[in-house]
Amino acid sequence: MSRKKRIYKKNTNILQEPVFNDNVLLKFINCLMFDGKKSVAEKLVYNSFREIRKETSVDPIIVFNDAIRNTTPVVQVKSIRIAGSNYQVPMEIPTHRQIMLAIKWIIESARKRTEKTMVERLSKELIDAYKNSGKAIDKKISMHKMAESNRAYAHYRWQ
């Protein structure tokens, strides 16, 4: 058995969403999907994009990208144990995790809304995130407040 480390090539053929050619939208559809029913998730997203176009008369992909950008957190707190006590240490978040947290928060808050159909809930939540309001933005703000209040422990970041 060889002790040599194997170097694996990253997957270079990245899939893209067929209508808007957007990787983040493809990730959003995949996170929205239940039980492998991708066509249902795609219909939900495209119908909510139609609703967004009716309500705001702005290109829905611009609304979507701005909603994701407004919802992405920059810092998070991680619990680190030093000398028998736990500290909440603020740390920067890698960009792929920022996007995934934003997607997860938007979908989660859309599912908790009270509108009748998921299309309405998703479109309203995307519009709210586009306008810097809504539950997903509240989650981002609370995460940033937590990091700001624990800024005194930022020097523990190296551990």
From Swiss-Prot:
Disulphide bonds in the chain: none
GO BP: any one term: translation
Keywords (A to Z) from UniProt: Mitochondrion, Ribonucleoprotein, Ribosomal protein, RNA-binding, rRNA-binding
Single Gene Ontology MF annotation: structural constituent of ribosome
Pfam families listed in its UniProt record: Ribosomal_S7
InterPro entries, A to Z: Ribosomal_uS7, Ribosomal_uS7_bac/org-type, Ribosomal_uS7_CS, Ribosomal_uS7_dom, Ribosomal_uS7_dom_sf
Compartments it resides in: Mitochondrion
Gene Ontology CC: mitochondrion; small ribosomal subunit
Gene3D superfamilies: Ribosomal protein S7 domain (1.10.455.10)
Protein family: Belongs to the universal ribosomal protein uS7 family.
Function comment: One of the primary rRNA binding proteins, it binds directly to the small rRNA where it nucleates assembly of the head domain of the small subunit.
HAMAP family per record: Ribosomal_uS7_B
Quaternary structure, from the entry: Part of the small ribosomal subunit.
Protein name as annotated: Small ribosomal subunit protein uS7m
Organism, as annotated: Reclinomonas americana
Gene that specifies this protein: RPS7
